[in-house]
Amino acid sequence: ITCLSDINSK
């Protein structure tokens, strides 16, 4: 799954 941190990092 995609973590919130991963989305926020982009």
From Swiss-Prot:
Chief place of localization: secreted
A GO CC annotation given for this chain: extracellular region
Keywords: Cell wall, Disulfide bond, Secreted
Top-level taxon of origin: Eukaryota
Recorded coiled-coil stretches: none
Protein's UniProt keywords contain Disulfide bond: yes
Location of the protein in the cell: Secreted, Cell wall
Family classification: Belongs to the thaumatin family.
Protein name from the UniProt record: Thaumatin-like protein 3
Species of provenance: Taxus baccata (English yew)
